[in-house]
Structures are given as C-alpha cells and as structure tokens.
Amino acid sequence: MKDSSNLLEMRNISKEFPGVKALDNVTLKVKKGSVHALMGENGAGKSTLMKCLFGIYHPNSGEIFISGQKVQFKNSKHALDNGVSMVHQELNQVRERNVMDNLWLGRYPKKGLFIDEKKMYDETEKIFKDLDINVNPRDKVSTLSVSQMQMVEIAKAVSYNSKIIVMDEPTSSLTEKEVSHLFKIINKLRKQGISIIYISHKMEEILEISDEVTIMRDGKWIATEKASDLTMDLIIKLMVGRELTDRFPKKDHIPKETILEVNNLSDAKNELKNVSFKLRKGEILGIAGLVGAKRTETLETLFGLREKGSGDIILHGKKVDNSKPFKAMQNGFALVTEERRQTGIFGKLPIDFNSIIANIDSYKTSTGLLANGRISKDTQWVIDSMKVKTPSQKTLIGSLSGGNQQKIVIGKWLLRKPEILLLDEPTRGIDVGAKFEIYQLINELAKEDKGIIMVSSEMPELLGVCDRILVMSNGRVSGIVNANETTQEEIMHLSAKYLSVTGGVNNANQIKEKV
C-alpha cells in the first residue's frame, strides 16, 4: 500500500551498466509540496536515480509511483507530459532565440495554422509574475545572466504543470543574492503543492531550504532524515561512510624564497588596475573577492588569455612575456579554469586524450604519429598519482564524477612540470570527500615547491587551505592578509573597499548579507 502523503515513491530501483551496478535497491519517497534534498558524493548514484525518474534511463528492476499510480516513462518527453521536470546543471537553451521561444519550444500555442505570439507572451508573463521573475519574454536568452537563464528553466518546468521538479546543482554559479531569490521561488512552488528534488553539495543550503534529506553512497540508499535533525558533520559522515575529523588537511608545506613578482599589472580593458603581489616557492596564495572583483581576470591576464595593458610579470627575478597562453606555458605557468566542463575537458573524448592534450606536441614521433606507448604510460601516471577512480584509460572523461574530472585536469598540467599553478575555483561542483582529496593534492604540490595561486568563492576554503589571501575589490588589490591571522569579516570588509556607489550596489548588498 502506498503512503498517500507521498507524491513520489521510487521503490527498490536498481540500474546496471556493463561492469557497474550504478543503483542497488534504492528507495526514495517525496512528500507533496516539500523540498527533498538528494545528497551523496559524486558517483553515489544521484544523477542516475533522477535519470531513471525522468525516463532517460530505464531501471533494471524496481517501481515508480506518482500520486499512487504506477508509471514507467519511455523518455523525457513522456515524463514532462506527466508532470515531471528537470532543471539540469548544464542549462540547455537556444541562446539566439528569445525567452518565450525557449519556454514553449516544440509546443507553441497556435491560432489556426500560425503561432499565437500574443498568447505565448501572455502565458509567459503570467508565469513570470507568479514566480516574481524579472525577465522580458522577448529578450534573447544570450543577453541573460546565468541566474536569469535558470529562472527561465524553472518557469518552463512550471509551464508543463509539473508536480515534481528536479533541480540539479541549481546554485553552482549564483551569487548569494541570486540564491536568496531562487529560494523565494522554491518556497512559492512549495506552497503551490509542487515537490522539489534538490541536488546540491552545499550543505548550508540543504539545511536551510530542505524539509527532508536522502543520502546515497556507492549506488545505495543510506538514510532519509528530516533536515532539522541533521548537522553538517552528520551529513558528511553519512555521505562518505566515515568521519572527516578536519575539513582541511594540515598545512605542512613551508613557503620558501620568492618565485614570482607581479608589479602594477593592468589588462588592456583597464578592468584590472595595478595589481601587485609576490608569490613564494611552496606557497598557496588565495584570491578572495565578490562577484565582479576581477579575480578570474587576474589569472587570465597572468596566463595570456586576456591582453595585458601594462605592468610586469617577473619569474625568478627576470621579466617574462606571457602575452599568449603558449608563451605562459613555456614559461612554466598552468591554468585550471573555472568552468571545467566548458574549458577544462573534452567531455566526449577519453581520459588518455584529456591527460596529454596540454602537452600533445611532445608525443609526436618523427613520422608525425603519436607515441601511444608514452601516452599510455603518462595517462596511467595521471590516474595513479591523482588517485582517479576509473575503469579504463579509454573511459570518456565526461562520464566521470566532477572530482575525478578535476584531478585529470590538474594532472594534465603536471605532466608539463609547471612552476606556477593557477587554480580558478578548483573545487566548484565537487562533493565533500573529493574536495578533501583536492585540498590534499594542492598541499602536496606546495610541498614540491610549486607556487600556487587559488581563486575561491568559499571563504572557509581560502582560510583552511591558503597561507596568505590577496583580497580584490573592483579590479584592485585591497589587501593581503595572513590566512592564520585574519577573519571572514576582515576579508569581507576588504572586498568592499573599492566598490563605487553606482557600480557596487549589488555587491554591497552581498556584503551586508554575509557580514
């Protein structure tokens, strides 16, 4: 007998792929009008379970009930037509079409033989008004922020009269203010009786927005608890199967002499303004700042992705020319980019290709062919030294968890033996267990005398991993502090130092929310 309070019941779901049991007898029950968080390390089976719900995968065994009725969706369209929607982490929109086109694509309202644009506009406006979404239905999607694109996807789910909406890492690219707006929308949906399945690695958010939390590990159901009964420590223990006594490894590297000096660095657009700092061998230098502080732009200018306007980059006491990425690479610089899936990996290609791509010319033989033996050897070095979990070198990198993808991205650069490693949000979208492994790896690299510059939006991460923290505000350095002696409040105040009255209103609001 099915519990009438549950809108969704997935019972004893199992799913196998060749050589892998991705789901093993998993049960998930979601109440009507609730926010039910789904948590687990990457590879725990969360996405596979949701793909079984959404008709992308078909389970080998188990049953799915919605409102007490057994369902078996043939595909995602079948799921949508029956009130199940999914807002994916990677937003899939036609950017050159307008917002309402994207909302109603493939099911335009008709007036005779023609599309009824007025009805389409009115229906879109009504949904936006109900959800407090401030977007013009006639704007091109390409003009929207990531947050606005996400709101459009949620509105699209509502337009299908969805009873269940799955949100996969919905806040991974949002500011605190945008997260707050998203939570207001989620609460409106909850009041309308819509159930939200919320997938996230951000434990603070889970505890704030969720009614119940289900935790998975290694393809199995581990626990379902009321969010109010959980703590961050208990969630971590359930997720990883052990206690993480410390969120960050011990800082046992010792910074040595100065290896890099950056003097009055500005970019050609003058968004960076006279950035100066020093980096020592074996040092981890964090870069903090609010959205718009130009942290990523600093790394891109150092690496030659962004044109330098003025200033000097001095390595081992000598000026170096990093005007192009290939020159920066020759000078011993490496950049792990913020958007791993877009700019860090070739998702549809195997691990071996992704491991050697940053150094591919060195694998060419005199005949112009690739030395497959060396490629295999070096790929195995990346897999072993980075502790990558994969069945094969030929596994498509896009099929791996975010943590394993990031390890390969770092490993490919280490094959070049860089001296300066630039890390832009290195743990974004990575679960708590894999984060600890990345922190350990960064610490080990510092012990090997690499100079490391690390951008992060997570304040505890900067304080827990770095030796010093350079704080940026509106393209300028507003202070450099010792990580062991500073506080989050000091860093936040430094982040606001150069905000203008007109240009920094949104960021100033972030300061008020955080401090």
From Swiss-Prot:
<keyword id="KW-1003">Cell membrane</keyword>
<keyword id="KW-0677">Repeat</keyword>
<dbReference type="InterPro" id="IPR050107">
    <property type="entry name" value="ABC_carbohydrate_import_ATPase"/>
</dbReference>
<keyword id="KW-0547">Nucleotide-binding</keyword>
<keyword id="KW-0067">ATP-binding</keyword>
<dbReference type="InterPro" id="IPR017871">
    <property type="entry name" value="ABC_transporter-like_CS"/>
</dbReference>
<keyword id="KW-0762">Sugar transport</keyword>
<dbReference type="GO" id="GO:0016887">
    <property type="term" value="F:ATP hydrolysis activity"/>
</dbReference>
<keyword id="KW-1278">Translocase</keyword>
<feature type="domain" description="ABC transporter 1">
    <location>
        <begin position="8"/>
        <end position="243"/>
    </location>
</feature>
<feature type="binding site">
    <location>
        <begin position="40"/>
        <end position="47"/>
    </location>
    <ligand>
        <name>ATP</name>
    </ligand>
</feature>
<dbReference type="Pfam" id="PF00005">
    <property type="entry name" value="ABC_tran"/>
</dbReference>
<protein>
    <recommendedName>
        <fullName>Galactose/methyl galactoside import ATP-binding protein MglA</fullName>
        <ecNumber>7.5.2.11</ecNumber>
    </recommendedName>
</protein>
<dbReference type="InterPro" id="IPR003439">
    <property type="entry name" value="ABC_transporter-like_ATP-bd"/>
</dbReference>
<dbReference type="GO" id="GO:0005524">
    <property type="term" value="F:ATP binding"/>
</dbReference>
<comment type="function">
    <text>Part of the ABC transporter complex MglABC involved in galactose/methyl galactoside import. Responsible for energy coupling to the transport system.</text>
</comment>
<dbReference type="GO" id="GO:0005886">
    <property type="term" value="C:plasma membrane"/>
</dbReference>
<dbReference type="InterPro" id="IPR003593">
    <property type="entry name" value="AAA+_ATPase"/>
</dbReference>
<feature type="domain" description="ABC transporter 2">
    <location>
        <begin position="254"/>
        <end position="499"/>
    </location>
</feature>
<keyword id="KW-0472">Membrane</keyword>
<keyword id="KW-0813">Transport</keyword>
<dbReference type="InterPro" id="IPR027417">
    <property type="entry name" value="P-loop_NTPase"/>
</dbReference>
<comment type="subunit">
    <text>The complex is composed of one ATP-binding protein (MglA), two transmembrane proteins (MglC) and a solute-binding protein (MglB).</text>
</comment>
<comment type="similarity">
    <text>Belongs to the ABC transporter superfamily. Galactose/methyl galactoside importer (TC 3.A.1.2.3) family.</text>
</comment>
